[in-house]
Amino acid sequence: MVFVKTLHRTLFLEVAANEDVLSIKQKIEAAEGIPAEEQRLCYAGRQLEDSDCGIDSEATIYVNLELLGGAKKRKKKVYTTPKKNKRKPKKVKLAVLKYYKIDENGKITRLRKECQQPSCGGGVFMAQHANRHYCGRCHDTLVVDTATAAATSGEKGGKKGKK
């Protein structure tokens, strides 16, 4: 005896130990009216073929119906242009040394100006431009007067490297 769970109810069928799945499908067709070729029988997590036999007594067989249609297998998308490589920032070893200078007496002086905003806190240096200092974190800009900057630094301003 096996239990057959259909869509609406559970059937009890007398099945011999050596009986194949095709004969079980025919018994279900007689009881329920579902054609044998549309039935899909599942037992122990796998679908049974018509030639399978040797189902245990008091086993539960699930009846599923054949479904029409289904989604097509999609093609893998082929891109015409290659992927754009992300820009990797250059690693500078001991970059902190650019922010400080040590004289012959051993005195440490800051080369860059620190940001005064309370949101940045200490240790955030501002970028040096020709006429201003700029904080990349809080976007604070301090404009430097060109007359005083030229007098203190001894340079005329303009682009670096050209003399």
Curated annotation (Swiss-Prot):
One Pfam family in the UniProt entry: ubiquitin
A GO biological process held by the record: translation
SUPFAM superfamilies on file: Ubiquitin-like, Zn-binding ribosomal proteins
Cellular compartments per GO CC: cytoplasm; nucleus; ribonucleoprotein complex; ribosome
Domain Ubiquitin-like: 1-70
Entry GO MF terms: protein tag activity; structural constituent of ribosome; ubiquitin protein ligase binding; zinc ion binding
Covalent crosslink: Glycyl lysine isopeptide (Gly-Lys) (interchain with K-? in acceptor proteins): 70
Chain positions of all zinc fingers (C4-type): 115-138
UniProt key word Secreted: no
Key words, A-Z: Isopeptide bond, Metal-binding, Ribonucleoprotein, Ribosomal protein, Zinc, Zinc-finger
Sequence similarity: In the N-terminal section; belongs to the ubiquitin family. In the C-terminal section; belongs to the eukaryotic ribosomal protein eS31 family.
PANTHER family for this protein: UBIQUITIN (PTHR10666)
Stated name of the protein: Ubiquitin-like protein 1-ribosomal protein eS31 fusion protein
Taxonomic source organism: Caenorhabditis elegans
